[in-house]
Amino acid sequence: MKDKKLSRVAFDFYYASYDKLIEKEELGWTGWDNKCWKGTFLGDIKRLLKCELNQKNLVNIANYCMFLWNFEEEAKDGH
């Protein structure tokens, strides 16, 4: 029973994350290779950590952390 519930939560999280990425693209997001987003992501994470931690905010934090992680990986690769 726990495995099914965990699987469902992971599935819901995946789709919520995907929907957030699509929403950002529609608002002009050009991809995580655009360095101008780095400061915005850091600010958004700090702002969201002060808010109620609901599902939407956790998805947003996870997405912003993913973008920041990608910046670090690209820097290691010399991009």
Where are the language model's segments positioned?
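Flexible "arm" and connector segments at domain edges
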Residues: 1-79
